[in-house]
């Protein structure tokens, strides 16, 4: 009886080891499979001295919307307005006789023409309104943000990704466009 139990135990152990090895192989295969993503090269904007590379933002699809995962460094710490802008450009343009960083990106992407700034989940707001981007004390940003109304990568291609100085209250009151500051960093979504 002891010999039968011992043989059964070895058989179960061997079967379990094979099953775990197969499951681990499938897991590794899933991890290495190519997930479709867009990689946006982001530059800190300086129309006088020239732009400086500060990293990338990866955009991927999820069941809950598009996920924007930053891999950024060298930025001012704190919360920053984070938006998709209309045009695929980060070039400076002149406004009122002054060169403005990133003005070539145009305004917030608003294909439904709501003309309202709002929360990323609000149906009556710019589609380009994203959750605020958090930058750590060391200037790095790695926390992903979710855009629940955006579902497919093709929706955002041909626009730009903008980071503004200062936070974003997701409203047009008391200040327009969420009260965010100047355009700080930008990348074209290709």
Swiss-Prot record:
Cu cation binds at residues 83, 85, 108, 164. Disulfide bonds join 90-186. Residues 162-181 are annotated as: Disordered. It comes from the Bacteria. It holds the Pfam family Sod_Cu. Its cofactor is Cu cation; Zn(2+). GO terms for molecular function: copper ion binding; superoxide dismutase activity. Zn(2+) binds at residues 108, 117, 126, 129. Its EC number is 1.15.1.1. Residues 1-23 form the signal peptide. It catalyses: 2 superoxide + 2 H(+) = H2O2 + O2. Coiled coil: none annotated. Keywords: Antioxidant, Copper, Disulfide bond, Metal-binding, Oxidoreductase, Periplasm, Signal, Zinc. PROSITE patterns: SOD_CU_ZN_1 (PS00087), SOD_CU_ZN_2 (PS00332). Binds 1 copper ion per subunit. Binds 1 zinc ion per subunit. The keyword Zinc applies. PANTHER family: SUPEROXIDE DISMUTASE CU-ZN -RELATED. Belongs to the Cu-Zn superoxide dismutase family. Homodimer. This is Superoxide dismutase [Cu-Zn]. It comes from Actinobacillus pleuropneumoniae.
